[in-house]
């Protein structure tokens, strides 16, 4: 019972900290230590819960003494807790990275509070086992992210915010419509209860329509085909906010797609999974076009996010254990790698004052850390062993082969090479670039930011080396979410499909 109560802490601690920070906007030092300490503790608690779940069984927390399906339930299983742990870790580093960026101005806008409110929505989305509360968490994320995009009040930010909000509101409307139709059909909102009742119903046209509604809603959140909001939104954000959005916002949508189309709507595999694979292929191609079409390194980074979403959903679309396992592994890896990517890109813009790669003017010779970090990051994105992207991509390849999706497999290989090429092009100018012989006065990057970059580089290498440990977690997550009977037995054994 006591252990179950700990499940609320990864969401509760950032929420309480965000409220306290509102009243500490004039005290930078206390604010910094408070939010960094809060997210560090949140990461440690999440990791402890993950270790327990791996050694024993999933944890559930029923609020108010009301057991599922009637009450609100949080679920700590391998999938939710590895996502919470990874998200908490990168949020901690992102907030530490922004430590020295005009704190007085940031606190005047309550920037740390809104980052923490966004964290509440992200972590709550991973932990909830209830459909309506997932919607609530998505709306918390949407509200906080809208405020973060518009901070600074420039024309570019407001334009990007309008596109971002309109598309995400449409996604939210579809999500709410799907919830209403699903509740009318099955009479419950709890994940495990929904899974049981949908299995009892078998193939059903109404359920098929509902599953398609959820597919579109989550695709808008994940930037799966419906990516129009992403490049403009990410391009106007400062470094830490761009890293935050790239690491987490699309990943919550991808997580929802994985949870829904393995656990809930698995009886519609013949329709949904080929559609997912097709959408993934389109997304990869669009992302690949984007990374070679621009010289703006922030936009190149944004399209790298789109390509990676295509990789993840291709794994899900294979509808094989290997493919789904690879999708989850790559999802976790991509949170860390995209944080590193946007930290590096943001640092390059800060040092040179330019966003076009041809102005990098041999920067890596003067700042060798960025050259080394960039090379490691490229290999991780490309799936080169022994770096962190390799195990996930191998499993997705394996799943595509088992599924017979040779077109998706070929596109993944081609777009991976294009993604690496676009980054090697930046790297070339970092080492050898010379824009018309001009001298660029490089700014000095603060030492603490170099240390944070170094931490992320070490983690990227460690994930690749310790891949068997991570794969144990992702394999358990895959097994639980692809087996309705196992999920019911371990999560809500008291529920019956006909109740």
Curated annotation (Swiss-Prot):
Keywords: Antiport, Cell membrane, Ion transport, Membrane, Transmembrane, Transmembrane helix, Transport. One of its GO terms (biological process) is ATP synthesis coupled electron transport. It holds the Pfam family Proton_antipo_M. It is found in: Cell membrane. The chain crosses the membrane at residues 3-23, 33-53, 79-99, 109-129, 131-151, 162-182, 210-230, 241-261, 272-292, 309-329, 331-351, 370-390, 404-424, 452-472. One of its GO terms (molecular function) is antiporter activity. It comes from the Bacteria. Signal peptide: none annotated. InterPro entries: CPA3_Na-H_Antiporter_D, NADH_UbQ_OxRdtase, ND/Mrp_TM. Its main location: membrane. The keyword Lyase does not apply. The keyword Membrane applies. It is a multi-pass membrane protein. GO terms for cellular component: plasma membrane. Belongs to the CPA3 antiporters (TC 2.A.63) subunit D family. May form a heterooligomeric complex that consists of seven subunits: mnhA2, mnhB2, mnhC2, mnhD2, mnhE2, mnhF2 and mnhG2. Expression of the mnh2 operon in E.coli is not able to catalyze Na(+)Li(+)/H(+) antiport. It does however confer higher growth rates than the control strain at up to pH 9.5. The operon may encode an NADH-ubiquinone oxidoreductase. This is Putative antiporter subunit mnhD2.
């Amino acid at each position: 019972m006591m252990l179950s109560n700990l499940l609320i802490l990864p969401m509760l601690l950032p929420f309480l900290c965000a409220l306290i920070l509102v009243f500490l906007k004039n005290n930078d030092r206390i604010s910094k230590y408070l939010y960094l300490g809060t997210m560090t503790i949140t990461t440690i608690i999440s990791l402890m819960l993950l270790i327990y779940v791996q050694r024993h069984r999933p944890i559930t927390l029923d609020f108010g003494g009301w057991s599922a399906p009637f009450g609100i339930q949080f679920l700590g299983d391998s999938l939710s807790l590895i996502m919470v742990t990874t998200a908490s870790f990168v949020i901690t580093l992102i907030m530490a990275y922004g430590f020295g960026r005009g704190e007085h101005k940031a606190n005047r806008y309550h920037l740390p509070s809104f980052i923490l409110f966004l964290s509440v929505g992200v972590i709550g989305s991973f932990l909830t086992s209830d459909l309506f509360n997932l919607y609530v968490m998505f709306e918390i994320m949407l509200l906080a992210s809208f405020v973060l995009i518009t901070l600074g009040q420039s024309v570019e930010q407001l334009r990007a915010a309008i596109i971002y909000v309109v598309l995400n509101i449409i996604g939210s409307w579809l999500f709410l419509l799907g919830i209403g139709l699903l509740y009318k059909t099955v009479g419950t909102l709890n994940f495990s209860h929904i899974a049981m009742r949908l299995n009892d119903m078998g193939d059903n046209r109404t359920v098929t329509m509902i599953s398609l509604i959820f597919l579109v809603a989550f695709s808008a959140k994940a930037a799966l085909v419906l990516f129009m909001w992403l490049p403009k939104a990410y391009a106007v954000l400062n470094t830490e906010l761009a890293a935050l959005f790239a690491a987490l916002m699309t990943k919550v949508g991808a997580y929802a797609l994985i949870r829904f189309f393995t656990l809930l709507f698995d009886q519609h595999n013949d329709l949904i999974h080929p559609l997912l694979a097709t959408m993934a292929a389109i997304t990869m191609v669009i992302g690949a076009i984007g990374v070679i079409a621009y010289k703006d390194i922030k936009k190149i980074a944004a399209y790298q996010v789109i390509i990676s979403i295509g990789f993840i959903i291709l794994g899900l679309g294979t509808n094989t254990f290997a493919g789904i396992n690879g999708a989850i592994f790559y999802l976790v890896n991509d949170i860390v790698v995209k944080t590193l990517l946007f930290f590096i890109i943001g640092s390059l813009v800060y040092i040179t004052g330019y966003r076009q790669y041809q102005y990098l003017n041999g920067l890596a010779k003067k700042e060798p850390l960025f050259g080394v970090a960039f090379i490691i990051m490229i290999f991780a994105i490309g799936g080169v062993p022994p770096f962190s992207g390799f195990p996930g991509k191998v499993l997705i390849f394996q799943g595509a082969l088992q599924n017979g999706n040779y077109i998706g497999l070929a596109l993944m290989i081609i777009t991976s090479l294009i993604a690496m090429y676009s980054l090697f092009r930046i790297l070339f100018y970092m080492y050898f670039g010379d824009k018309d012989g001009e001298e660029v006065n490089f700014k000095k990057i603060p030492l603490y930011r170099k240390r944070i970059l170094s931490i992320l580089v070490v983690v990227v290498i460690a994930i690749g080396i310790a891949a068997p440990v991570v794969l144990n977690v992702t394999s358990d997550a895959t097994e639980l979410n692809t087996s309705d009977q196992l999920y019911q037995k371990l999560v809500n054994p008291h529920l019956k499909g006909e109740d």
